[in-house]
A protein has these predicted regions:
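Ribonuclease/tRNase effector modules and their secretory precursors
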Residues: 1-80
């Protein structure tokens, strides 16, 4: 799948209440999680690929996982 599919549906990206606290904890951020992740998707330096049922976005030391059907941010964490 082409990453343009994710970019065309960026307005659908969201997460659940528990996802917000988990992602904030994993990344050590206090800002809006959804906007943070959308900005990483839009960043030209991000590596975006689809594997199975998920999209993966890698940017610097961060990896974000988004469900390809529902566009729910599943998790985000630092890459070690």
């Amino acid at each position: 799948m082409d990453k343009n599919e994710l970019l065309m549906n960026i307005y659908k990206i969201h997460t659940k209440h528990l996802g917000i606290s988990r992602i904030k904890r994993n990344l050590g951020i206090e800002e809006d999680v959804v906007e943070f992740c959308k900005n990483k998707v839009l960043d030209k330096k991000s590596l975006i690929y689809r594997k199975g049922k998920n999209w993966y976005i890698e940017n610097g030391a961060i990896k974000i996982t988004i469900n390809a059907t529902s566009y729910t941010i599943i998790t985000a964490h630092t890459i070690k």
